[in-house]
Amino acid sequence: MLVWLCEKLVYLYSGFNVFSYLTIRSIISLLTSFFLSLFFGPRVILFLKKFQIKQIIRLDGPKSHLYKCNTPTMGGVMILVSVIFSVLSWSHLSNSYIWYVLYVLTGYGIIGFFDDYKKIINKNSQGLKAKWKYIWQSIIAISISVFIFLKYQNTNATKLVIPFFKDIMPQLGLWYILLSYFVIVGSSNAVNLTDGLDGLAIMPTVFISAGLAIIAWVTGNINFSSYLNIPYIKFSGELVIICTSIIGSGLGFLWFNTYPAKIFMGDVGSLSLGGALGIISVLTRQEILLFIMGGVFVLETISVILQVIFFKISGQRIFKMAPIHHHYELRGCPEPRLIVRFWIISFILVLLGISTLKVR
């Protein structure tokens, strides 16, 4: 939107040409979404408090969480608005990859919105039935996966990139649809499961978005992708704008979500951000790297799966409570310390993921 305007104004003043550079636009998009989040934050918090849109606490959860019952939720709407506005302002809207991500981001945001809304109306922690949530997530993930496969099949956009191996890049064929589906849905639900402590989910999301921004920039640059022996994907460079918009909005949200949180993102935020990370990794062909960089999310998800399976088999629990961050809480680890430790782990995993681009 603003990029298009600047391109028109360059004939009047050559200085507007600076907005044609991806690096400049990525920095501006980060700042735009950051300051929008800071601007909306206090206003959204007051609005949510006024209409009693507050967090519903699980009665079987840690007792230390009971004080959070009056904390406003659905703050993810603030994140979505900031990200979408920044992306529409500073990206080339003719780039189809931008719209693929916005489709998933918005679609999963709507699912999360209705999930949060139902929790608030029913005044319990049970929102949409798991079956219906999964069905709608699947519809969005399958539809975008099929569309991308039909449009880009047998190109670099449908190859499987394996870290550490520069010569092994098989064409996935129809397996592309299945892999993309699991990555998008899995990433969305993994972030959702992790979002149980103040700032626990948003900071790893920011770190991973930074990692994906570097990956998108390299993948969309024919010289760097050739140097690093990764597939060149023509349109992926513009995804940097989405990544930096998520970074800015996430940091702005963290301003109010850090311990003790004044607002929670709710499912409207966690489902949409997780879905966005998933589709970006699919479009840049770095699904395996997302698994590495998102190790905190993976750990949280595996802990839930193991807890459920082990309980059904033996009637006993592996952890005091799942996801695993609740286990450490119940063992006496203070929430702020636990959050920062997970942040540190996430940061290290993102650095590890980025380093694999060179180690091939």
Swiss-Prot record:
<keyword id="KW-0808">Transferase</keyword>
<keyword id="KW-0479">Metal-binding</keyword>
<dbReference type="Pfam" id="PF00953">
    <property type="entry name" value="Glycos_transf_4"/>
</dbReference>
<comment type="pathway">
    <text>Cell wall biogenesis; peptidoglycan biosynthesis.</text>
</comment>
<feature type="transmembrane region" description="Helical">
    <location>
        <begin position="130"/>
        <end position="150"/>
    </location>
</feature>
<feature type="transmembrane region" description="Helical">
    <location>
        <begin position="263"/>
        <end position="283"/>
    </location>
</feature>
<dbReference type="GO" id="GO:0009252">
    <property type="term" value="P:peptidoglycan biosynthetic process"/>
</dbReference>
<feature type="transmembrane region" description="Helical">
    <location>
        <begin position="73"/>
        <end position="93"/>
    </location>
</feature>
<keyword id="KW-1003">Cell membrane</keyword>
<dbReference type="GO" id="GO:0051301">
    <property type="term" value="P:cell division"/>
</dbReference>
<dbReference type="InterPro" id="IPR003524">
    <property type="entry name" value="PNAcMuramoyl-5peptid_Trfase"/>
</dbReference>
<dbReference type="InterPro" id="IPR018480">
    <property type="entry name" value="PNAcMuramoyl-5peptid_Trfase_CS"/>
</dbReference>
<keyword id="KW-0460">Magnesium</keyword>
<feature type="transmembrane region" description="Helical">
    <location>
        <begin position="339"/>
        <end position="359"/>
    </location>
</feature>
<keyword id="KW-0472">Membrane</keyword>
<dbReference type="GO" id="GO:0046872">
    <property type="term" value="F:metal ion binding"/>
</dbReference>
<dbReference type="GO" id="GO:0008360">
    <property type="term" value="P:regulation of cell shape"/>
</dbReference>
<keyword id="KW-1133">Transmembrane helix</keyword>
<keyword id="KW-0133">Cell shape</keyword>
<keyword id="KW-0131">Cell cycle</keyword>
<keyword id="KW-0132">Cell division</keyword>
<dbReference type="InterPro" id="IPR000715">
    <property type="entry name" value="Glycosyl_transferase_4"/>
</dbReference>
<keyword id="KW-0812">Transmembrane</keyword>
<keyword id="KW-0573">Peptidoglycan synthesis</keyword>
<dbReference type="Pfam" id="PF10555">
    <property type="entry name" value="MraY_sig1"/>
</dbReference>
<comment type="function">
    <text>Catalyzes the initial step of the lipid cycle reactions in the biosynthesis of the cell wall peptidoglycan: transfers peptidoglycan precursor phospho-MurNAc-pentapeptide from UDP-MurNAc-pentapeptide onto the lipid carrier undecaprenyl phosphate, yielding undecaprenyl-pyrophosphoryl-MurNAc-pentapeptide, known as lipid I.</text>
</comment>
<feature type="transmembrane region" description="Helical">
    <location>
        <begin position="199"/>
        <end position="219"/>
    </location>
</feature>
<comment type="similarity">
    <text>Belongs to the glycosyltransferase 4 family. MraY subfamily.</text>
</comment>
<dbReference type="GO" id="GO:0051992">
    <property type="term" value="F:UDP-N-acetylmuramoyl-L-alanyl-D-glutamyl-meso-2,6-diaminopimelyl-D-alanyl-D-alanine:undecaprenyl-phosphate transferase activity"/>
</dbReference>
<dbReference type="GO" id="GO:0008963">
    <property type="term" value="F:phospho-N-acetylmuramoyl-pentapeptide-transferase activity"/>
</dbReference>
<keyword id="KW-0961">Cell wall biogenesis/degradation</keyword>
<feature type="transmembrane region" description="Helical">
    <location>
        <begin position="94"/>
        <end position="114"/>
    </location>
</feature>
<feature type="transmembrane region" description="Helical">
    <location>
        <begin position="235"/>
        <end position="255"/>
    </location>
</feature>
<feature type="transmembrane region" description="Helical">
    <location>
        <begin position="27"/>
        <end position="47"/>
    </location>
</feature>
<dbReference type="GO" id="GO:0005886">
    <property type="term" value="C:plasma membrane"/>
</dbReference>
<dbReference type="GO" id="GO:0071555">
    <property type="term" value="P:cell wall organization"/>
</dbReference>
<protein>
    <recommendedName>
        <fullName>Phospho-N-acetylmuramoyl-pentapeptide-transferase</fullName>
        <ecNumber>2.7.8.13</ecNumber>
    </recommendedName>
</protein>
<feature type="transmembrane region" description="Helical">
    <location>
        <begin position="291"/>
        <end position="311"/>
    </location>
</feature>
<feature type="transmembrane region" description="Helical">
    <location>
        <begin position="168"/>
        <end position="188"/>
    </location>
</feature>
